[in-house]
Amino acid sequence: MPLQNSTLTDQSIVTGLRGEAAGWRWDASLNYGSNKFELDLDNTVNQSLGANSPTHFYAGSLKNEQTVFNLDAAREFPVSYFTGPLTVAVGAEARHEKYSIGAGDAASYTGGGSQGFAGFRPVNAGSHSRHNESIYVNLEAEATKKLSGGVALRHERYSDFGSTTSAKGSARYAFTDALSLRGTVSSGFRAPSLAQQYYTITTTNFQVINGNNTAIETGTFAVNTPQARALGAQDLKPEKARNYSLGLQFQPNRNFTTSIDAYRIDIDNRILFSANLALNDKLKAQLATQGSTVGAARYFTNAVDTRTEGVDIVSTYRIDLQDKDRLDLTVAYNHNKSTVQKIADNPAILTANNLKLIDRQSIDRITVASPKDKFSLAADYGFGIWNVHGLVTRYGSFTVPQNDVKLDQTYDPQWVLDVSGSVKLGKNWRLVAGIDNVTNRYPAQVTSNGNLNVNGTQPYSIFAPNGFNGRYYYAKAGYSW
C-alpha cells in the first residue's frame, strides 16, 4: 500500500521589551512563526506512466507563515465610588500572514498522478498573503466588595475583508466568600483563512456509490477559480459568533474548588467543505474545458449557521503532604450539543444537475461525529524536584455519518490512560518523559461499507477522538531562564 512520508518543520522566534513609563506598564513583542509540511510517497506508482513510473514521489509542500507585532500598556486609576481601582489596558497589533503551496515533481501529478495522493500541480502552486491591524481597550474594576466586572472592545481592519468591531462584557458577583456567580457575553469575528481561500488540489478521494466506497478523481478548487464558479461557488464571507456563558464557583477553602459553567456559541456563515459533488457528463465536460479532468469536485463555502450548547464541571482538590509534597486531584466533565440552525441556499447550477451543496453527511459531521460527553480524572504528585502526572479520559460515543443512514456507524465510549514524569535539574532544566495511551487502546474497526476502510488497509475511523496510533512514548527537555 502507498506509504506517506511527511516532514513537518516548525520554526518560531519571539523577542520583546517591557518596562514602565508615566505610571503605565508596557510590553512590546515581535513574533515570527512558520509551519511547513512536505509530503513524499513510497511504494506506489503513477499508472499513467506505465512501466516508466517511479515508486517514490515528492508530492509538494504547504507552508504557513505569520509575523505579529504587539504593544500593550496598562495601569490602575483610583475611582472614589469603587472599592477597587479601575484597571485600563490598551493595545495595538499588526499581523502579516502568508500561505504557500509548492508543486510536487512532475511524475507525482502527470496524468492521474501518484496513487494515494496526487502531487500538487504547478497550477496549484503559489503564494498568497494578507495583513491586518487592530486596536483594543479593556476596562476592569471591582465596583463593590461583591460585584466586579469588565468590558472590552477590539477593532480590526483586514486587507482582504474590511473592518470589524467585536465586544466583550463580563461580571462576577460574590454571594459569600465561598460562592460566586459569573457571566460573560461576547461577539467574535473570524476571517476565512488563507488556506480556505486558496487551497487547491486534484487527488483520489472515495465516495459512496451504490453502498460501496468508490475511488474518484476529485478536484478541490479555490472559490475564485473558474471551476468552482462553474459549480456555484461564491466569495467566502467571515464567520461571526456570539458567545454566552454563566457559571457558579464554589471555594469553601484554599484547597478545594468546584465550578459549573453553562455556555452557548452561535456561529453564522460557518465555513465548511461542500459535499463531494459527483459530476455528471455535462459538468465533467464543462470543467474539462477549464483544464480539470475530474469525476467529483468540492470547495469551501459558508455552509451553515450553527449553535453549540454545553456545560463544563471542574473540581480540584489539593492535598498538602509532609516535606512540602503535594497531591493535586482534578475531575472534569463536559457535555455539549451542536445543532444546525440554517443551511445555505443551494446554487441554481447544482439544483439543475440534481446535486446538493450541503448534504446529510456534511450536516451530521457537525452534530454527531464528535462525542457529546467527555470525562477526565487527573492526579499530579509533586515531591522535591520530581513530579508525576496521570490522566484517565473517557470519550463518549460518536457516529460517523453517511448520506444513507443505513451506512452510519456508531462507536462505543472509550477509556484512555496517559502518564508522565518530570524532574527539575538545577534552576533552568526540566526533563519530561511519558506514555500516552498506556493500555494501547484502539477504537473499534470500521465495519460499514460507507466508512472508508479500503479493503482493510485503513481499518480505523479518522473521527476517533483519541486517534488510532495506539501507545505513544515521548521524552523532551526544556530550558528556561
Question: What is each model feature region?
Answer:
Residues 1-3, 52-61, 120-125, 152-157, ...:
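Extracellular loop and loop/strand-boundary signature of outer-membrane beta-barrel proteins
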Residues 2-14, 19, 32, 36, ...:
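Outer-membrane beta-barrel transmembrane domain signature of Gram-negative proteins
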Residues 20-25, 76-87, 146, 178, ...:
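Short loop/turn motifs that connect adjacent beta-strands in outer-membrane beta-barrel proteins
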Residues 21-23, 32-38, 77, 92-100, ...:
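Transmembrane beta-strands of outer-membrane beta-barrel pores
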Residues 26-30, 86-90, 149-151, 167, ...:
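Transmembrane beta-strands of outer-membrane beta-barrel proteins
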Residues 90, 257-402:
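Gram-negative outer-membrane beta-barrel transporters
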Residues 123-132, 174, 178, 191-259, ...:
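Outer-membrane beta-barrel signature, preferentially recognizing the C-terminal barrel domain
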Residues 267, 337, 392-401, 422-481:
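C-terminal beta-signal and adjacent terminal beta-strands/loops
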